[in-house]
UniProtKB/Swiss-Prot annotation:
Record keywords, A-Z: Cytoplasm, Methyltransferase, rRNA processing, S-adenosyl-L-methionine, Transferase
InterPro entries: RsmH (IPR002903), SAM-dep_MeTrfase_MraW_recog (IPR023397), SAM-dependent_MTases_sf (IPR029063)
Annotated compartments: Cytoplasm
Residues the entry annotates as binding S-adenosyl-L-methionine: G35, G36, Y37, D53, F80, D101, Q108
Catalyzed reaction equations: cytidine(1402) in 16S rRNA + S-adenosyl-L-methionine = N(4)-methylcytidine(1402) in 16S rRNA + S-adenosyl-L-homocysteine + H(+)
Entry's EC annotation: 2.1.1.199
Protein name: Ribosomal RNA small subunit methyltransferase H
Annotated organism of origin: Rhodopseudomonas palustris (strain BisB18)
Amino acid sequence: MTEPSRHIPVLGQEAVGLLAPRDGGVYVDATFGAGGYSGLILAAADTRVIGIDRDRTAIAGGFDLVERSGGRLTLVEDRFSNLAEVCAAQGAGLVDGVVMDVGVSSMQLDQSERGFSFRLAGPLDMRMGQSGPSAADVIAVASEAELANIIYIFGEERHSRAVARAIVAARAIEPITTTRALADIVGKVVHAKPGEIHPATRTFQGLRIFVNGELDELHLALSAAERVLKPGGRLVVVSFHSLEDRIVKNFFNARGKTGGGSRHLPELDQEAPSFAILTKRPITAGPDELAGNPRARSAKLRAGERTAALAHPGEDLPAWPTLDAVMGRR
């Protein structure tokens, strides 16, 4: 059996405990990252794991685990919203479990050249897949109103209009191309009190989510997981901020109860629940994990078990700002 990855994933034991890997099962680590969840799954049972990540650096970093797995781990460079297509291409059919660790990885945050962190000097990049427009590109061309919407909707920054105004004023003088430059601009209009988060936290979050289309990706990935899980298969999702957790919570709530049907057309069948919810309340990190990994403080884990009911129809994506809409006009 494979030794676990040296990387310790947030809520890793809880996540794998809920997945309950069994010999001969097929599991999808939809956000491979540093391979922590994959390593734990491979160590727990004689399973096959398909690891997906849009970041080619993460895929390259996982080759050692691939070798140690004895052929039980396959890595695929792709978005996790495409997990159904990935499973089909790998001949996996329906799978026994899917785990998702949503958002930016610790590895990405710690690499200054990736431009995710306001604490490290680097280019203002923020692309998980290292292709397409960067955060600097968005900052350069988005209107003041668009920037304010992006920072407010995806960063939940209540000073978004002031931040957007400051960005537009600063870029008129010189391009904003580094993390430090943007953090300094934000710090002049957002003033944190002692003990509060860094003034640039929400602005960086908003830009990162926007650049990578993270919330749309999550919506699509959850629906894809619903389609590829066999009855009894389990979906485990770890999220790190309220926007993500709300999407996951609403997904499980919508699929964990019988559809309302129509009082006007009572003969129509109600939608049967496609998931049995395993976590009535989200699981959070305990004091021991928090002592060793402060980044776990905002993590919430939710899980569900697939029933034999048909997958629910996919909902329309929310009408929030998109990268194509902002960049496509330029």
